[in-house]
Amino acid sequence: MSIEVKDLKKKYFKKEAVKGATFTIESESIIGLLGRNGAGKSTVLNMIARRIEKTSGDITLDGVDLHKNPNAMHEVYLSSSDNWFPQEYKFKDLLAIYKVTYPEFDMKFAQDLIKVFDVNVKQKYSKASTGYKSIMKIILALANPSEYIFLDEPVLGLDANHRQLFNKKLLEAYARRPRTFVIATHLIEEVASILEKVIVIKDGVVTEEVLVEDVLRKGYVVSGASTLVQEYVADKKVLETDQIGNFTRSVVIGAIGEAQPGLEFSPLTLQDYFISITRKENE
C-alpha cells in the first residue's frame, strides 16, 4: 500500500507554489519531507489531505484517486501548525472528540503521552503556549490510528528536551502500531536519526527522493587550512565549500580517502547534504 503523487501542482493566481511534485509515500515507514521555509512543503501536505484543492496532478492510494475514496481519506491525518481546533475547547474535549471520530484512537497511549509531556488537559487550547499547542497536536497525531500520519513542523515552539522526547515517542507510536509517518520540517539534524527516507522539495519542485542510508554514503566532509583543503579537493567533485578566514570546510562526493596531515575527515550528515543541495546561488 502506498500513496503516489504525480505531477502535483498548485497555482495561486500567477504564482506557482508547487510546480509538478512527483514522489511515493510507502506504507509503514518514517519519511522526512525536507525543504526550506517557503519551499512548498505545507502546500503539498494540505493538498494530499485535501485542505486545499490541487490545481492539477494525481494523488492515488493503491492506484485509486485518494480524494474520490472517503474510506481512503479516513486513513490520512494531517497535523499542521494551523489552528483548526475550536479555541474554547479544553484538551480533554479534543480527546473525547477524537475517540468518537476514530474508534481505534489509542487512548491509553494518549494518556501516557499526557503524563510524560506534563499536559494540563483542563487548559483551554486558546490559553496554551505555542509549545503546548504543538504538544497537544503531537499527542492527537501519535495516538491516531490512521495509516498515514502527516506532521507539518511538529516541534514548533518546543524546547530541546521536548523535541528529543517527540522523536522517542514517535518511534514508540510506530512500534505500537506500524504505519507511515511523514515529517515535514526544515530542522533536519534533530529528526535525521529516525528517518528512513527523505523527499527534498526546493522552490516547489521535488529534487531528491532517496533513502537516508544512501545519502550518508554519497560523500564526506573535509576541513582544515584553506590551502590544504583546496589542494585536496582540486580533482574531486565538491558539493559545497565554506570558508572562514584561513579555515575551509568542503562537502565532497565520493568515498573518503586515506588520512592526510593537516586535514580532518568526517562522515556526511543528512543536514550537510540538505544544506548543500538547497542553498541558493547568492548565499
Where are these regions (language model features)?
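The feature captures the beta-strand-to-loop junction immediately N-terminal to the Walker
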Residues: 31-36
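Helix-to-loop junction immediately C-terminal to a conserved catalytic motif
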Residues: 49
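Conserved ABC transporter NBD signature motif
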Residues: 57-71
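ABC-family P-loop ATPase nucleotide-binding domains
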Residues: 71, 80-136
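Catalytic Walker B motif of ABC-type/P-loop ATPase nucleotide-binding domains
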Residues: 149-153, 158
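C-terminal coupling/interaction segments
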Residues: 240-283
